[in-house]
Structure formats: structure tokens, C-alpha cells
Amino acid sequence: IFFLFSCEKSDDNKIELFVSGAQIAGVNGMHFGPDGLLYAASVIGSDISIIDTETNEIVKRYDLSDGVIGPDDVAFNSKGEFYWTSILTGEVAGFNVKGEKVIAGNPGPGVNPITFSDDDRLFVAQCFFDNGLFEMDPSGQTAPRVIKDEIGEFCGLNGMDWGPDGRLYGPRWFNNEIVSVNVDTAEIRKEVGGLNVPAAVNFNSKGELFILDTGDGKVVKVVDGIKSDYALVELGLDNLAIDANDDVFVSSYSEGSILKVSPDGIEEVLPGGISHAGGIAVAGNDLI
């Protein structure tokens, strides 16, 4: 936010930085690429930022000029190609190994989480605008396959990951639970209940399940069906990602921050701040 101290022409006029915002306009889905860098999607910012979590720097950014439109989540296949979902338009697209944009299809607005299986099958689900689960053709040559056209009220699945049992795991936002899906038979099984507002799941290399419960502002760890609080963070969280060292990172849609979290504490990767301000007003001595 900048303050302009006068509207009259004068050599004394100046623009002063009053408060700086977040480096990303609200962080949504995240995924570590084969290069070890963290790829973070932003719907409001309409970009995908690539972050070095060792130096805490944004090293590259894909935006509208690259054909990235309102991305909500991002995922990689075994070739190193990455795809994203555009929640507002319904487009599912990616960049192939040549760096060319490829449109996989459009199952409709609300496409939110995205993931590749180990054999490079592409899956997306809808949340908030609709509630379906689909398999997509990454090349866009065949229409999306409907696995389930209604998984949960107002939201199918959010941030998804593959379990060690080969099933697709994901949170049902409004149902306070985690389910798994057999993507070939569409059979759904409840895995974890008693959550507040689960937003995302991820497995580490040991096969341990981590859940981001955005309603309670915390990360929950599940081992042998037993839940425990892994890290108490803050409200306004959106998604989580786990790196090759099993370190856990969470994103904030409200603050635009990325945090590394553990039972020992919280480390800032990207600090939060004003991430999508809509206006400004002054009331007495208060800036609103």
C-alpha cells in the first residue's frame, strides 16, 4: 500500500510505502517438483510460483502471459511435466516436456485438487462449485471419465494424495472426514472421521498420513488409525506438501504465506501479509 501525500504539483510530493504485502496473493495448492523446488498455485494471483525452500526465494513464476489462469492446485507426472486446475473456468492444463501448454479438458468449474498416479494417470476433483471426481486424458484427446459425479455435498474432494494401498485419499470438506476411493470401481471408504474442516491430505515416505485441518488451523498425523496433533499453526490454511526429506509445508490462502511446520515449531518460507486487499479507508486514527 502506498500513500500519496498531495494531489497538487510540488517538488515536495512523494509516494511512501506504508505497508508491504505478501509475495503471493494467497497460496493454494502446492507440490514439490522433481527438481526439489516447491510449486505453489494462486487462484487470486493467477500464477504458479516456484520456490526454493532452502533459500526461501521465488526463483520463477508462471502467469497469464504463459497461459496459466487462476490455478488452484498443481501436480507432476513421471516425465517432469506439471499440470494445474483452473477452479473458475474448469480448465485442466499443463506444460509438456517441450514447455508447450496442453489442455487436458474441462470437466466444469470447481476443478480443485489434481494428482497423477504412479503410472501417470491424471485425476481431478471438484470442490465448492460442484462435487465430481474425474480421470483426465493428459493429452486432451479423449473426454474426461466420470468416476463419481457426487462425492459430498458442495465439495467432492479437496487436496488429494495416493495411499500406500493404491487408493486415492482426500478430504470431504463439509463432512469432517477423510475418504479413500478405488478409482477403477468408484468404491468409497471412510478412513478418518472427527475432523473440523479437513482441506488436504498427504503421505510421507513411511506411508504416514498427514491431514491439514483448516477449521482448527493445524496439521494432524494419523498412524495405524490413531490421530495426533502434529503441528498447531493458524487459521486460513489451504494446503500442504511434503518434500523428499519428509518435511511438512503448509500454505495460507488468507495470508499468502508458506510455512514449514513440525512438532518443534514453525519456520517461515515465505512471510505472510496483505494478500488480496480490496480497498482501504481511514477512520480517525485507524487504517482499515
Region locations from a protein language model:
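A short beta-strand motif characteristic of beta-propeller blades
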Residues: 14-21, 57-64, 99-105, 142-151, ...
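A short loop-to-beta-strand structural motif that recurs across blades of beta-propeller domains
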Residues: 47-50, 91-94, 131-135, 177-180, ...
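Short loop/turn segments that connect beta-strands within beta-propeller blades
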Residues: 52-56, 95-99, 136-141, 181-186, ...
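N-terminal, post-signal-peptide region of Sec/Tat-exported proteins
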Residues: 33-60
